[in-house]
Regions:
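Ribonuclease/tRNase effector modules and their secretory precursors
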Residues: 1-98
Length: 98
């Protein structure tokens, strides 16, 4: 796992899930890490998918300039990436109106 996130944060993910996400959504988990360095990112809970563990959603700009939605869980002090994709128009508006 590459360390592209902001200093002080540790990331992890399932390698097969990361490969499938890149194939299906055109976004790598390496790029997704960089969203956590966006000071304007917006974070909110994902109660509909929080079965067994709390999942969170972060919408922010990557270092490639793309606004992404990243789904993750916090486990043992690490951020476990679950999925990421480019935002919809409505999600982009939510981010921009911050």
């Amino acid at each position: 796992m590459a360390d592209n996130g902001p200093p002080g944060l540790q990331f992890e993910w399932d390698a097969d899930k990361a490969q499938a996400n890149a194939r299906d959504h055109g976004v790598t988990f390496e790029e997704a890490q960089t969203v956590f360095g966006d000071p304007l990112s917006r974070t909110f809970p994902d109660p509909d998918h929080s079965v067994g563990e709390e999942r969170l959603i972060d919408i922010g700009s990557s270092t490639r300039g793309r606004v992404l939605m990243v789904v993750y869980a916090e486990r043992h002090g690490r951020i476990r990436l679950i999925s990421c994709r480019s935002v919809t128009r409505q999600e982009r508006r939510y981010y921009e109106e911050g």
